[in-house]
Amino acid sequence: MENIAPALLDWFYANRRILPFREDPTPYHVWLSEIMLQQTRVSAALPYYERFLAALPDIPALAGCEEEKLHKLWEGLGYYSRVRNLQKAAKIVCAQYGGQLPADYNALLALPGIGEYTAGAIASISFGLPVPAVDGNVLRVFARLYNDPRLVTDPQVKREFTARVMEHQPPAKAGDYNQALMELGALVCLPNGAPLCEQCPLGTLCRARAAGTALSLPQKTPPKARRITPVTVALVLNEGRVLLQQRPAKGLLAGLWQPVLWEDTTLTAAETAARLAALELDCTGAHFTPLPAAKHIFTHIEWHQSGYFLTVPEQPTPAGCVWAGKEQLEAAYTLPGAFKVYKKLLLTKLL
């Protein structure tokens, strides 16, 4: 196949989105943006990116940030393991590389939370190294470009696609080339049966377009069914404060704060009262008002939430819990997006 780089780069320079991490592509900026964009759209991530950098402008600041502040800066993005790995890597970078990311692909790859794609993006965009950065967008572009019906999730197929990517990469413009492929996949060679083939700079070279198969590519393994998990939530209030409990240090939503809840069960009001009593919480005379049903989807789990709102008298704080007022809920304690329906309700109830 004819080399795609000239047409691709011409298109990219004329059509690329103006993004802050492109205008100032320092290694830290590119790293942070790529971690944020792993599970988040660009438009949604930009406010978080700017807020995060304003609070933590460099890697040493990230390494030294308190965990609760770090979680608060990430609140709303979800997948909190991303930001925990970000800080773990920052601490290693400070200890081993003087607070600056190393200009070496393999050294980047060894850091927590940095996989082949992210290492390639940092190495090529920030350091100009001629290495690949192959994400889902790039796999989709090449599956269609070569009209390749194989599963792009197969490791061997991905290696072959990566080799094809490198065949076309101009070493002196590796970063721009990698970004151009990502941008083409994000703006033109769209997923879910909606490619804008008439706008594609590679349209005359695209074998899937010529064969009429672009809509069926790339082939992917069907996703596994998510496990449905019932969850009972108790919004326990006292004097303008809500009772929060901290999740375990490992596992789903590790270390984050949540309303009092019980997983894998749907409880009646009486059963909820008994569970609260087991936490040594006095609910005598409390009225249990049903909460609206809510649903939250994780990667492999789907929470179906229900529960109750109640007000209790002043009393000792149960072990592993805190009482949080509205100001603390907004500024200090990170409530994951799984509880956004109930957080919105709480903010109307708290003084």
PLM segments and residue spans:
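Intrinsically disordered, low-complexity, charged terminal extensions of DNA damage-control enzymes
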Residues: 1-18, 23, 186-351
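Catalytic cores of DNA base-excision repair glycosylases
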Residues: 5-7, 11-198, 202-211, 215, ...
